[in-house]
Amino acid sequence: MSEEVAVDSMEYDVVVVGGGPAGLSTAIKLKQLAAENNSELSVCLIEKGSEIGAHILSGNCFEPTALDELIPDWKEKGAPLNTPAKKDIVKFFLTEKLSFGIPFASFFAPNFNNHGNYVMSLANFCRWLATQAENLGVEIFLASQHQKLFTKTIQ
């Protein structure tokens, strides 16, 4: 005797896989573009972690140009960019407890100049981006393990 298994299905115009900075930014931009064009667009984001940022383990020195374009009023919306990078130092660790630093001359490598950037927790930033996405109508599903994604091409 064979048993039929009930399959839950949900339909969205766009499914974004992954709740990191790229996936969240994509979902936000899609909803912004839909709003600019007075069009309805259903967007969901699926994340394998139990919460947004659960698998983001690093800190970050964040350059905000892309965020200025994506969410121009990010400061007013409380983005967790509270610690400006004030100086660049290269630190040499001789042992676990003994180190010394030397100022980094950014004219040798201008791409490493962090003036105007922020030191932050990338996980906290992703959680903030998720809130912005939800405010735009993106549905976020956490701890998601999906077996199959059905796609349909629109002609």
Where are these regions (language model features)?
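Short, glycine/charged-enriched secondary-structure capping and boundary segments
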Residues: 30-32, 58-61, 105
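Feature captures the FAD/FMN-dependent oxidoreductase FAD-binding
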Residues: 81-155
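N-terminal FAD cofactor-binding segment of flavoenzymes
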Residues: 40, 48-97
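Catalytic cores of large soluble enzymes that bind and process phosphate-bearing ligands
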Residues: 12, 18, 22, 26, ...
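A short, basic/flexible loop-to-alpha-helix module at the beginning of a structural domain
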Residues: 1-11
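Glycine-rich, histidine-containing beta strand-loop boundary motifs that form or position
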Residues: 19, 47-49, 142-144
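N-terminal Rossmann-like FAD-binding beta1-loop-alpha1 element of flavoenzymes
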Residues: 13-44
